[in-house]
Amino acid sequence: MSITVFEHKQAKVIIPTTPYRVRCNCAAMVGQFTIGAAEDGVLKGREAELVIVKTIALQGDLGQTKDASWLQVWFIPVSGQLPQNLLMVTHLKTQSADNLGRLETEFVIEGQDLNQSVFKAEFVKRAGAYGDYWAVRWTHRAPQSEVEQDLLEAAALLRDNLPLFDAETTRNMKLVSNEVKLSLPESASRGRRTKK
C-alpha cells in the first residue's frame, strides 16, 4: 500500500491508497469511533474535531442494517484520539446523519459557508424503544489557527480534485444523488438557481 502526503501551505494531509475507514459505533455499550472490525476494533473516543472534505448520500445495506439511508463522510481529524491529518471515511445513518444535515441546512439559511468551519462530532447517549443507543451530535466553530485555515483550503482542493468514494464498503448501496457539496454557489445563496 502506498501513501500520499498532500501539502498545502502549512497543512499536510496523509492520503492512504485504501480508504481509512472509521466506524461511528452507536451500539449501547460502545458509543465511540472505532477502527477495525466491530468485535475487536480499537476504540478511539467519543469526540473529535474535524474538517469535512465531502459527503455523499447513499441508500442500501451496510453490515446488519438493511435498506437504510446513509451519509458517506470524508474528513480529516484535527483533534481527538483519531489520527490527525489523515484522510478518513465513515458512514452515518438515521439520527447522526440527520444531525449533520440539520446543521448544513442551518448554514444555508444563515448564508454561512460550511467550508469555513471546523466540526465537532460528539457521541451522546439516547434512550429508544429498543434500549439505549448513541448518536453523533454535530457542532462547529471557526478555524483557530493558520494551520486549521490551511487545512480547510486543502480540504477544498481535495474535494475538487480527488475521486473520493468508498466503493468497497458501499457495494450494496446506490447513490441517492450527486455528491453533496458543503456549500451552495454564491448565486444560489442570493436566491437564483444554477444548473450543473
Predicted stretch roles:
Residues 117-156:
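OB-fold/S1-family single-stranded nucleic acid-binding modules
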Residues 155-163:
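Acidic, low-complexity/disordered segments
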